[in-house]
Each structure stands twice: as structure tokens, then as C-alpha cells.
């Protein structure tokens, strides 16, 4: 029938006829790969029957002999997605565990290739600056690992040391520059404290409160490599890791020492800017204090030249040392040593003047003895005329008696009286008073 139709229409090309026949065969003979798994048996029976009837269809008869097509899957179903990220960004278990480690559910125990960020743990994109773990890889830090019993020898200690953290612990940001490492390590230490690992952080003396366990060391090693890529580490950190790439504790200890050094630098600058000196302390002690501060700042990279140092020192001088501001302010090339020579000269002059002054202070016992001897030996017996005396009336009576007797005596007695005017007149009374001439 079909050959008759083709002979009736010779203008139709042979290619079009072949295309129509091919399309008809596709519709009549369906490929068993497109059939669901529930109809596999029927497809096999149909293909067997077709093979017995038509020997010219080898494609359909060869399908059931292939063991790989025993349980075909629908071609239209997409592959399942494992986690919140696309399938092409995920890694297989063998790729995630190149060292042969067992696959842990706890994110802290996932082994990482040193200083390499896998797309599985840190997918590209601006959605977050922190690493995010897919649900199929790890659980929150508060959830114990389902395989922890097969991995850790002491699961109770591991739960208390590592998994007894907050449910959501914010990780530190990614290190992006060597200059940001001092600030980054502060956030990393805070992250360890929030993860109940504050006891393993070195203290001021460089020693931790307790001994770190192997599991905690693994957690330290893994998290440090994730959040601090090697290309952004300072040189001194790389030097430590080149000796021992797991010595994260030494890096933390050195970082804490540098933090203390930075605090000391700030204190030295404040002390140098607020210097005060008036000679109350020895000049040697003041010079030692200032030179130690300047040398310490210079060793730490903060250079203080002579001009700035002299200005800061002279700014704090007071008292007799204050005039050094005006005698030396024009000397542009003056050094700190020359300035302290002038300070020493003034201090020695002050000490010499204090030692040369006589000491007029007398002992208290000597003063008491002098006061006693004065009151006992220097009591006056000759008393000058005092109009407030109580016995003034008796003195007047005695004077009147003497005057009357002198008038009644002969003239020879007048000469004796005139001669004795320079001698004190003695009165014979019970008070034993002596009157000087001219006082009455």
C-alpha cells in the first residue's frame, strides 16, 4: 500500500519518505527504556513476541539481554539534591575525606585539607560571610554525633568538653588580610570561649587553665584553617606553622603576648605625655624612668626622636627646673642626654644648698633646762618704781620720814647725803626694798 502511494507521488523525495516511515516505526515500537519499572515484564514479553514474528528488528530484541537495563528509571525525574546547595557544588564522601577518616556527623570533626576551602563547606556567593554546613554533613554543635560512640574512647568527656556549647555559636569572620589578624584573633578567642573552650586558651603567663584534649586540638586545627586561610596569615604565624602545622596553641599564646604589648605601648605613650618633675625625686630615677619608656617604644616600632622627647620632658618640668624651657627652647639639635645634664646640675645644686644651711633647731630637753635655770637664778631684787604696787603707801611714809630727819640734822650731815646720792638707799623694813636715787 505504501509502495503504491510512493509510486503515485514521484515528486516526493526519498528522504521525506524515509522520514515518515521512521517516525511511524518510533510510534509503533516504543523504546523499553522509556517504560516505567512496573511494566518491565510486559515489555520483555512484547519484545520476545516481536522477535519471533519480525526478524528484522534487532534493536528491540537486544534490549532485554542487557543486564544494566533490568530496572530502568524514568528519564524525566531530576537527580535528588543533597543539602541546600546545588549538586555540582557538593562533594562526595571520598572527596571530603581524602585522609581515610570516617564520615562524622559533627561539623567540628570533619577533616579538611590544610588551608583549602571546599565548596561543600563554603559555597561561593555573597549570601553570607560565614561558612555554612549543609544538613547532610553536620549538625549544630549542641547535637552529639551519631557515630561518636565508635570514634571517641570517652564519649562523656567529649560531650562535656565539645558538644555542651550553645545551640547557635556565631563563628568568627573570614580573615582577608594579614593586617587584620590581631583583630581577627580576638574574635576567634571569643568564638572558643562561646564554645566552652575558654579553659584551653593561654592566660597571661602563657599557660592554659587545663590540658587540651585530642578532640579539642582537632577542633582548633580545623576551625583555624577554615577561617584563617594561609595566604592571609602574617609572617610570624607562617613561621610557627612551618615548624609544626598543628601548633595553634602557640599562635594563640603569641597573639595574647602581642595584645599585652600593644596595651603597654599605649600606657607608655600616655605616661610620656604626662611627665611631671619638680626635684622631689632623685634625678637619676627620673632619667631611668624616661629612658626606659623611650627605648621600649622604639623597640616596638614607635620611634620617639630627640626633639619630641625633649619637648615632652620640658613640658612636665616645674619649680626651679621650669626655666629650662626657655634656655633650651632654641636648641634644635638638643638631645635627651644633654637635657638631663642640666636637670642633674640643678638637682645637685639644690642638694648642696640644703646641706650647707646650719641647723638652728635645739633639742627639747635643752630648752626645758634653760627655762628652769632662768627662773631660779635671775630673780631681780631691785625693783623699779611701779605705781601699781600694793605697798606703795608704805614707801611714801618711809620717804617722808627720811626727809624730816634730813632737815633736822646738822649741816655736816648734808654733805654726807649729797655724797651718797649715787648709792642706793636701803630701807629697814620687812620687805627689804632698795630705792634708787631720783625715783621718788
Curated annotation (Swiss-Prot):
Pfam families for this protein: TYA (PF01021)
Segments for region (RNA-binding): 299-401
Entry's Gene Ontology cellular component terms: cytoplasm
A single GO molecular function term of this UniProt record: RNA binding
Intrachain disulfide bonds: none
Cellular compartment(s): Cytoplasm
Site (Cleavage): 401-402
Compositionally biased spans, kind Basic and acidic residues: 429-440
InterPro entries: TYA (IPR015820)
Quaternary organization: Homotrimer.
Entry note about domains: The C-terminal RNA-binding region of CA is sufficient for all its nucleocapsid-like chaperone activities.
Protein name per Swiss-Prot or TrEMBL: Transposon Ty1-OL Gag polyprotein
Name of the encoding gene: TY1A-OL
Amino acid at each position: 500500500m505504501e509502495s503504491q502511494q510512493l509510486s503515485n507521488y514521484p515528486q516526493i523525495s526519498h528522504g521525506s519518505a524515509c522520514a515518515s516511515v521512521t517516525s511511524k516505526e518510533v510510534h509503533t515500537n516504543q523504546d523499553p527504556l522509556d517504560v516505567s519499572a512496573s511494566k518491565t515484564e510486559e515489555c520483555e514479553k512484547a519484545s520476545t513476541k516481536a522477535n519471533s514474528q519480525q526478524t528484522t528488528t534487532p534493536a528491540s530484541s537486544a534490549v532485554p539481554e542487557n543486564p544494566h537495563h533490568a530496572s530502568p528509571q524514568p528519564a524525566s525525574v531530576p537527580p535528588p539534591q543533597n543539602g541546600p546547595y546545588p549538586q555540582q557544588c557538593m562533594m562526595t564522601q571520598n572527596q571530603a575525606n581524602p585522609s581515610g577518616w570516617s564520615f562524622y556527623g559533627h561539623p567540628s570533626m570533619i577533616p579538611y585539607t590544610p588551608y583549602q576551602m571546599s565548596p561543600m563547606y563554603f559555597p561561593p556567593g555573597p549570601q553570607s560571610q560565614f561558612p555554612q554546613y549543609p544538613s547532610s554533613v553536620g549538625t549544630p554543635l549542641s547535637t552529639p554525633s551519631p557515630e561518636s560512640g565508635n570514634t571517641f574512647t570517652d564519649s562523656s568527656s567529649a560531650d562535656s568538653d565539645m558538644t555542651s556549647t550553645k545551640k547557635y555559636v556565631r563563628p568568627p569572620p573570614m580573615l582577608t588580610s594579614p593586617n587584620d589578624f590581631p583583630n581577627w584573633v580576638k574574635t576567634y578567642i571569643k568564638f572558643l570561649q562561646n564554645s566552652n573552650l575558654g579553659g584551653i586558651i593561654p592566660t597571661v603567663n602563657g599557660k592554659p587553665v587545663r590540658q587540651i584534649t585530642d578532640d579539642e586540638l582537632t577542633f582548633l586545627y580545623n576551625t583555624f584553617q577554615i577561617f584563617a586561610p594561609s595566604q592571609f596569615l602574617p609572617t610570624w604565624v607562617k613561621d610557627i606553622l612551618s615548624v609544626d602545622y598543628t601548633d595553634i596553641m602557640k599562635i594563640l599564646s603569641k597573639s595574647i603576648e602581642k595584645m599585652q604589648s600593644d596595651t603597654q605601648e599605649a600606657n607608655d605613650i600616655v605616661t610620656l605625655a604626662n611627665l611631671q618633675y619638680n626635684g622631689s625625686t632623685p634625678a637619676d630615677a627620673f632619667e631611668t624612668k624616661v629612658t626606659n619608656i623611650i627605648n621600649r617604644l622604639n623597640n616596638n616600632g614607635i620611634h620617639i626622636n630627640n626633639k619630641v622627647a625633649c619637648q615632652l620632658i620640658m613640658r612636665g618640668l616645674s619649680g626651679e627646673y621650669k626655666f629650662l624651657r626657655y634656655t633650651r627652647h632654641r636648641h634644635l639639635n638638643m638631645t635627651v642626654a644633654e637635657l638631663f645634664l642640666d636637670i642633674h646640675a640643678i638637682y645637685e645644686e639644690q642638694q648642696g644648698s640644703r646641706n650647707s644651711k646650719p641647723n638652728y633647731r635645739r633639742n627639747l630637753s635643752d630648752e626645758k633646762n634653760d627655762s628652769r635655770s632662768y627662773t631660779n637664778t635671775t630673780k631681780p631684787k631691785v625693783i623699779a618704781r611701779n605705781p601699781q604696787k600694793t605697798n606703795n603707801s608704805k614707801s611714801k611714809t618711809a620717804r617722808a620720814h627720811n626727809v624730816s630727819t634730813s632737815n633736822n640734822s646738822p649741816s655736816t650731815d648734808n654733805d654726807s647725803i649729797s655724797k651718797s646720792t649715787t648709792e642706793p638707799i636701803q630701807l629697814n623694813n620687812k620687805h627689804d626694798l632698795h630705792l634708787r636715787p631720783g625715783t621718788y
